[in-house]
Amino acid sequence: MSKGIMIIGPSGSGKTSLGKMVADKLGYPYFDVDDYIWRRDTEKPYTVMYSREEKINRLSKDIFPYEHFVMAGSMSSFHYAFDDKFDMMVFLYAEPAVRIQRVHERAVERFGERVLEGGDLYESHLRFLDDNRRYEKNGSPNLNEQREWMNNMSCMKIEL
């Protein structure tokens, strides 16, 4: 059975960077949960999700061949299907101002003027930034649900 390290936290906290670094250091494959949540065959990115069953099936199929793996991201609606596969869980946190800046810079780097005022992704980008600002309260994902998930896990836990 595959066993892995799961890195959670708000967008812009550095999950992907840490996940890739740890995977590289350990020689494990890295899986970004976003790749299993959002359909890529859409005109506007990050607008259409796979169904819960598709998320679980696609990710399960990809990690199956590996004894160990590193995974990062938010899987609030389907983590139950993977909880027994984690040997370690890392909660990574960054202050809201730092996160918002990182998320905005990343979006501009990926999508250019599309996320700036007048662009076709501007409104969805603003909603995403607002949701990230609300991580400590009622965003999706949010601090309380991720802490609860981590507290209910029986694996090793680290907070950074």
Please place each PLM-identified region on the residue numbering.
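Hydrophobic anchor at the beta1->P-loop junction of P-loop NTPases
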Residues: 7
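NTP-dependent small-molecule kinase module
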Residues: 2, 25, 130-160
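Walker A/P-loop
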Residues: 16
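Conserved beta-strand scaffold positions in the cores of enzyme catalytic domains, especially
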Residues: 30, 89, 155-159
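The conserved Walker
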Residues: 11
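Glycine-rich phosphate-binding loop used to anchor ATP phosphates in small-molecule kinases
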Residues: 52-97
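A glycine- and Lys/Arg-enriched "phosphate-lid" helix/loop adjacent to the NTP-binding pocket
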Residues: 93-141
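Conserved substrate/cofactor phosphate-moiety recognition/catalytic segment
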Residues: 20, 24-64
